[in-house]
Amino acid sequence: MLKIENLCKSFRTEDVETIALNNVSFTVEDGEFVAIMGPSGCGKSTLLNILGLLDNPTSGKYFLGNHEVANLKEKERTDVRKGEIGFVFQSFNLIDELNVEENIELPLTYLNISKAERKAKVQAIMKRMAISHRAKHFPHQLSGGQQQRVAIARAVVFGPKLILADEPTGNLDSKNGAEVMHLLTELNHEGTTIVMVTHNEHDAKIAHRTIRLFDGQIVETEGNQL
């Protein structure tokens, strides 16, 4: 379970304070698929960065499972990210110098598992994502849809409990976007919790719930919590 309580985030530059999140509270149950929507600048990406332990809130609490994680030390935050959270980005964020196989294997290198086990996990997820034939290709040799498949494979290869997806179909045409959403839905049906930021109303309807932000506050929640 993921739970945030009265989460606030502000940024100060010289004498100007910008409030990105203002007393945001919600719970995401295990196995739930939640979409977060709102206009540009409403705090969606800031919220996702905090959920992914890439940033700290100014105040408020964040529980991941039974642990309060908002104010962990950096090493502890890194350990949680490596073991429990998978990230999928709009711009894919693949490493240009690594081929498909190496990109997918990267998060496994931080875990205490053998090379043989790493290879087996990579082969299995490439087969599932239908990209085995691209194993030795580099990102620039792939289409946008193929790059996002690689990014999803990298995000899930170590079996995270939570996937955070930031506009996962934003750079894709409708066909490839639909395929990516199908993959995320399959993962969710298997029990993976997903929180997805999106501007796409069609993508949001696939989620169990949609949380709408405006000026850093929740203004509406649609759908039913699991």
Residue ranges and their predicted role:
Residues L2-T210:
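ABC family nucleotide-binding domain
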Residues T210-G223:
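H-loop (His-switch) and adjacent beta-strand-loop-beta switch element
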